[in-house]
């Protein structure tokens, strides 16, 4: 989830 983390 890009809104929370950059990896997933």
UniProtKB/Swiss-Prot annotation:
Alphabetically ordered keywords of this record: Amidation, Neuropeptide, Secreted
InterPro entries, sorted: Kinin_peptide
Localization: Secreted
Keyword Secreted (UniProt): yes
Any one of the GO BP annotations: neuropeptide signaling pathway
Gene Ontology CC annotation, any one: extracellular region
Annotated positions of the Glycine amide modification: 8
Statement: the UniProt record of this protein carries the keyword Cytoplasm: no
Domain of life: Eukaryota
Functional summary from the UniProt entry: This cephalomyotropic peptide stimulates contractile activity of cockroach protodeum (hindgut).
Entry protein name: Leucokinin-1
Species this chain originates from: Rhyparobia maderae (Madeira cockroach)
